[in-house]
UniProtKB/Swiss-Prot annotation:
Its main location: cytoplasm. This is 1-acylglycerol-3-phosphate O-acyltransferase ABHD5. The HXXXXD motif is essential for acyltransferase activity and may constitute the binding site for the phosphate moiety of the glycerol-3-phosphate. It comes from Rattus norvegicus. Keywords: Acyltransferase, Cytoplasm, Differentiation, Fatty acid metabolism, Lipid biosynthesis, Lipid droplet, Lipid metabolism, Phospholipid biosynthesis, Phospholipid metabolism, Phosphoprotein, Transferase. Belongs to the peptidase S33 family. ABHD4/ABHD5 subfamily. The gene is Abhd5. It catalyses: a 1-acyl-sn-glycero-3-phosphate + an acyl-CoA = a 1,2-diacyl-sn-glycero-3-phosphate + CoA; 1-(9Z-octadecenoyl)-sn-glycero-3-phosphate + (9Z)-octadecenoyl-CoA = 1,2-di-(9Z-octadecenoyl)-sn-glycero-3-phosphate + CoA; 1-(9Z-octadecenoyl)-sn-glycero-3-phosphate + hexadecanoyl-CoA = 1-(9Z)-octadecenoyl-2-hexadecanoyl-sn-glycero-3-phosphate + CoA; 1-(9Z-octadecenoyl)-sn-glycero-3-phosphate + octadecanoyl-CoA = 1-(9Z-octadecenoyl)-2-octadecanoyl-sn-glycero-3-phosphate + CoA.
Length: 351
């Protein structure tokens, strides 16, 4: 009954996350709701064999962070905290929870503005947006009374994990960046090996006023089939757990709710998906005692040179780059066993 009450609480918190004509229009055109998202998440987590606790962690301004906790009464070990990427949610770690939580507490949460966390209105300034994300992570940590943590972030989560570590270094025992977004600067057109075609630049300019995933919401009742057509790979990645469309349904319902975190992300970017405030310009200021591990997929289309760049910016600090063979951008789902093993090895260097 207690878990059910917690889930009911978060539904009411989500409902207050956005307002206006768009929020009212979305459920009518898009076959989704907070209840649909809750059901989709429960299907994702149904195959996780270990026990866990889930609840909304209250932070400031009436917001809450939807959280999964795998404790196993191992309070002496430094907890591992997982931050998902853009357009994702905590459910996407389903292939990793059991293995990663065998000998230490593991926490995963939906970033503010994503998944089942509150969806507030973010600032339009990139620096302020970043700070809002960072402060939400710090308030979450304080609410759970975690002293220090091993902070792991994928994609946008990697960028935010680095930003948090810069501001609150005393709380981070090890920073693990998994295919992080937002590190390099946007290259000059003259420096690019393959210049961006004119039609792509024109399309990018035309879509500038819109959020990155606006097409899903515009597609309305056809949005789910759109996800299934555009990203059939997600079904394959999780085929060991699910034979149906559980994963694509979860991704769909995560991304057709009020676009709070999505708008925040857009305000942090410049065409074509580059960060306004690249992390490589600042990562050299990270406290020298914080070890950094960078994990990337050997088959990823994302620039895998960030680890080398971080190493050159922190010559006297621990920086290790790890390539996962056979993995693309979604390393943790492409090669979960290898990914889990590497992360556990990193964690064992802490305690």
């Amino acid at each position: 009954m207690k878990a059910m009450a917690a889930e009911e609480e978060v539904d009411s918190a989500d409902a207050g996350g956005g307002s206006g004509w768009l929020t009212g229009w979305l459920p009518t055109w898009c076959p989704t709701s907070t209840s649909h998202l809750k059901e989709a998440e429960e299907k994702m987590l149904k195959c996780v064999p270990c026990t866990y606790k889930k609840e909304p962690v209250r932070i400031s301004n009436g917001n809450s962070i939807w959280t999964l906790m795998f404790s196993h009464n191992m309070s002496s070990k430094t907890p591992l905290v997982l931050l998902h990427g853009f357009g994702g949610g905590l459910g996407l770690w389903a292939l990793n929870f059991e293995d990663l939580s065998t000998d230490r507490p593991v926490y995963a949460f939906d970033l503010l503005g994503f998944g089942r966390s509150s969806r507030p209105r973010f600032d339009s300034d990139a620096e302020e947006v970043e700070n809002q994300f960072v402060e939400s992570i710090e308030e979450w940590r304080c609410a759970l009374r975690l002293d220090k943590m091993i902070l792991l972030g994928h994609n946008l989560g990697g960028f935010l994990a680095a930003a948090y570590s810069l501001k609150y270094p005393s709380r981070v025992s090890h920073l693990i960046l998994v295919e992080p977004w937002g590190f390099p600067e946007r290259p000059d057109l003259a420096d690019q090996e393959r210049p961006i075609p004119v039609w792509i630049r024109a399309l990018g300019a035309a879509l500038t006023p819109f959020n990155p995933l606006a097409g899903l919401r515009i597609a309305g009742p056809f949005g789910l089939s759109l996800v299934q057509r555009l990203r059939p790979d997600f079904k394959r990645k999780y085929s060991s757990m699910f034979e149906d469309d559980t994963v694509t349904e979860y991704i769909y319902h995560c991304n057709v709710q009020t676009p709070s975190g999505e708008t925040a992300f857009k305000n942090m970017t410049i065409p074509y998906g580059w960060a306004k405030r690249p992390m490589l310009q600042r990562i050299g200021g990270l406290h020298p005692d914080i070890p950094v591990s960078v994990i990337f997929g050997a088959r990823s289309c994302i620039d895998g040179n960030s680890g080398t760049s971080i190493q050159s910016l922190r010559p006297k600090s621990y920086v290790k780059t790890i390539a996962i063979l056979g993995a693309g951008h979604y390393v943790y789902a492409d090669q979960p066993e290898e990914f889990n093993q590497k992360v556990k090895e990193i964690c064992h260097t802490v305690d």
